[in-house]
Amino acid sequence: MSRYRGPRVKIIRRLGALPGLTNKIPQLKSGYTNQSVSNKKISQYRIRLEEKQKLRFHYGITERQLLKYVRIARGAKGSTGQISLQSSEMRLDNIIFRLGIAPTIPGARQLVNHRHILVNNNIVNIPSYRCKPQDFITIKNSQKSQTIITKNIELSQKYQIPNHLTFNSLEKKGLVNQILDRESIGLKINELLVVEYYSRQA
């Protein structure tokens, strides 16, 4: 399944706030009832499905990528759900978003694809690149790249950078300090439901 490219407001009306997808918070019309909180009995499958969809749409990853992260997490020591989240959070496009270099993860992905981003002084144009502790993120030394990033940083100054990252706004340089902990995840989600959804597939 490919990435979603349809109306973003429609998605967050159904699933709730997804800051990685869009910074918009729609005002629900009077009398509007979110399907997920309607009086109808909701199946456990649907609950798990919607939690999985939150993860997919927030991080902008494909079904195949998410399933891959769950499979890797199952083979690692520790909580499968938490390790799956860490895999998504440590993607380069998400790191750029969390540093405030891009307003959304799709915006961050575009910066990477257009070769505006360097990791450890090397251009990386793979959004799914997995960042590691002590990786430093910088901007390509071109007028176009610097102009785009400066504008993005000015717009995102109101957002707090999580503890596992450091960003020097003057040098436009970010640093990955460590693998993030569960409390630093930038999304309200029950990752155990995602693991349960994939229990027959992963």
UniProtKB/Swiss-Prot annotation:
Upper taxonomic lineage: Eukaryota, Viridiplantae, Streptophyta, Embryophyta, Marchantiophyta
Cellular compartment(s): Plastid, Chloroplast
Record-linked HAMAP family: Ribosomal_uS4_B (MF_01306_B)
Pfam families: Ribosomal_S4 (PF00163), S4 (PF01479)
Coiled coil: none
Species for this entry: Marchantia romanica (Liverwort)
Protein name in UniProt: Small ribosomal subunit protein uS4c
UniProt xrefs under PROSITE patterns: S4
Quaternary data: Part of the 30S ribosomal subunit. Contacts protein S5. The interaction surface between S4 and S5 is involved in control of translational fidelity.
Function as written in the Swiss-Prot or TrEMBL entry: One of the primary rRNA binding proteins, it binds directly to 16S rRNA where it nucleates assembly of the body of the 30S subunit. With S5 and S12 plays an important role in translational accuracy.
Record-level GO BP terms: ribosomal small subunit biogenesis; translation
The S4 RNA-binding domain, residue ranges: 90-158
Gene Ontology annotations for the cellular component aspect, listed alphabetically: chloroplast; small ribosomal subunit
